[in-house]
Amino acid sequence: MAMAGADGPTAGAAAAVRWRGGESLLLLLLRWPSSAELVAAWGAARASAVAPALAAASAACLALSAMLLADAVLMAAACFARRRPDRRYRATPLGAGAGADDDDDDEEAGRVAYPMVLVQIPMYNEREVYKLSIGAACGLSWPSDRLIVQVLDDSTDPTVKGLVELECKSWGNKGKNVKYEVRNTRKGYKAGALKEGLLRDYVQQCNYVAIFDADFQPEPDFLLRTIPYLVRNPQIGLVQAHWEFVNTSECLMTRIQKMTLHYHFKVEQEGGSSTFAFFGFNGTAGVWRISALEEAGGWKDRTTVEDMDLAVRAGLKGWKFVYLADVKVKSELPSNLKTYRHQQHRWTCGAANLFRKVGAEILFTKEVPFWWKFYLLYSFFFVRKVVAHVVPFMLYCVVIPFSVLIPEVTVPVWGVVYVPTTITLLHAIRNTSSIHFIPFWILFENVMSFHRTKAMFIGLLELGGVNEWVVTEKLGNGSNTKPASQILERPPCRFWDRWTMSEILFSIFLFFCATYNLAYGGDYYFVYIYLQAIAFLVVGIGFCGTISSNS
């Protein structure tokens, strides 16, 4: 009876569990491994798969870092030993009869001295800046009968189109030769507008074309300082000026951008100009010889970096480029984080996609020597357009944080400290006025490398969004005292609309790695990882740059 009484409640409880559908749960709990078994399983997986994979990634990143360092050293050396353009090329000022053989006809000599120049200004709904660029172009010191200002308006806002057309007519009434051109479609975006603009009949009389984006304001003597290089040196196809920024002090993000772009111009552009007479056209603040542009095949819209595409094709035809560091053109930096992201995606994705499209053409062309092809494929494209984006993210945001969790893998000190320090110093040498922003620049650039790496793979593999084109938002002259919200006249956005979960989640991962290293590690990686985690979090919650309704 006692035995039966004991069995009865037990059987009833088991039946109740089965009745509630809990039998499988009980079996799962009974079979669930203990903590010791889990630790042992993780140790085996870590030793057999995770650690070897991380070690391979570390070795690859270190090799790529060495490539970056070598390229940075060579470019820095080229800049310090630079050959000034005015010492390598003839660039005496233009004057009556200058640039032509002896000619008794003063009028004809003057026409040769001041060739016909076309100024193209592509724009798209540029409400805040259209007056700046049109006014600056019309104010260029050049004979009015030798200059045509062509405004290529792709605006979809009828109000903006009306304002731009009215501004063109206003300058036309002042005696300036201003042509207002519109299209029925936006096919090809900027490249399509520039290409169609060159098809106009009046362009046939022009020898050179200067291009300015809508927020660029050339100084009156811009043509007087650039055109002589083209007139005196028939082998030169492009003259590129330096960008100067009117809103550098607007926020920390614009200061960091200025450092990055200053290095790009002072090292990459200047180094390419003085060593190989080649660099990527920046799309604005430059003057092309129209015959060089046409020989290269004209504008193509196959990528979002139509300017670089044109430069590569012109370089393959043997045309030389000149960068003039002392000719500066005022422009505006994007001060809004979302706008800056779109710009960086377009530049990074487009460059990688162009590498994919022209790599074979560069390799098999017979029109340029081997060393020039090697420079273009290895240094210009692979190192600067691929490696430069992958290494900051993979090494400093993935491999190093993961290595604190995997004791079997140790990243050597030279790869963690010496190489990045040397590269940073090479950047700082050309940015002495902003050297105190170097720590912020490093952390912010590592965060942006997350987006650039993704954009690079999209372009290299031609994935979705490869031809995504978003016009960079411009707010007008940096001296404008009105806040951005008043300029844009748009309702403010909610703060959580600016959040990006990818950065926030990545910051959580970095915080975990840093805390683990602080608790169990024998080194001080947690100091850097904590700082990088904070940088990801700050960017992730949108607390970076100025705020507008598009943020």
UniProtKB/Swiss-Prot annotation:
GO biological process: cell wall organization
Similarity field: Belongs to the glycosyltransferase 2 family. Plant cellulose synthase-like A subfamily.
GO MF term list: glucomannan 4-beta-mannosyltransferase activity; mannan synthase activity
Source organism of the structure: Oryza sativa subsp. japonica
Known EC number: 2.4.1.32
Keywords from the UniProt entry: Cell wall biogenesis/degradation, Glycosyltransferase, Golgi apparatus, Membrane, Transferase, Transmembrane, Transmembrane helix
Function description: Probable mannan synthase which consists of a 4-beta-mannosyltransferase activity on mannan using GDP-mannose. The beta-1,4-mannan product is the backbone for galactomannan synthesis by galactomannan galactosyltransferase. Galactomannan is a noncellulosic polysaccharides of plant cell wall.
Subcellular location: Golgi apparatus membrane
Pfam families associated with the record: Glyco_trans_2_3
Catalytic activity: GDP-mannose + (glucomannan)n = GDP + (glucomannan)n+1
Binding site for substrate: 213, 215
Gene Ontology cellular-component terms listed: Golgi apparatus; Golgi membrane
CDD domains hit by this protein: CESA_CaSu_A2
Protein name: Probable glucomannan 4-beta-mannosyltransferase 3
Spans through the membrane: 60-80, 386-406, 409-429, 504-524, 525-545
Residue numbers annotated as active site: 154, 307
Topology within the bilayer: Multi-pass membrane protein
Superkingdom of source: Eukaryota
Enzyme class (EC, first level): transferase
